[in-house]
């Protein structure tokens, strides 16, 4: 189990990313636009750098919904490998069966 503080920190990051997503996209569009002047690009880069560090989506970490474990995460199920195995053995995941050959 991950510490509650780590789970809360990750939740706070997700909220920050959602809050700044639109503004970040606008600034990045200005920076990537070849028709923008050099000054506009510069101002957009400065504004982007002044945003909080946690506003970037690359700072997010996928975590298991049940335990908060950051490694061995399966996106399709939102679970870590351990909890996914337990759920599959209980039959909680439709269509998922243990491999046998």
UniProtKB/Swiss-Prot annotation:
It comes from Pseudomonas aeruginosa (strain ATCC 15692 / DSM 22644 / CIP 104116 / JCM 14847 / LMG 12228 / 1C / PRS 101 / PAO1). This is Small ribosomal subunit protein uS14. Part of the 30S ribosomal subunit. Contacts proteins S3 and S10. Binds 16S rRNA, required for the assembly of 30S particles and may also be responsible for determining the conformation of the 16S rRNA at the A site. InterPro entries: Ribosomal_uS14 (IPR001209), Ribosomal_uS14_bac/plastid (IPR023036), Ribosomal_uS14_CS (IPR018271). One of its GO terms (cellular component) is cytoplasm. The keyword Ribosomal protein applies. The keyword Ribosomal protein applies. One of its GO terms (molecular function) is rRNA binding. One of its GO terms (biological process) is translation. Belongs to the universal ribosomal protein uS14 family. Keywords: Ribonucleoprotein, Ribosomal protein, RNA-binding, rRNA-binding. Pfam families: Ribosomal_S14 (PF00253). SUPFAM superfamilies: Glucocorticoid receptor-like (DNA-binding domain). Gene3D superfamilies: 1.10.287.1480.
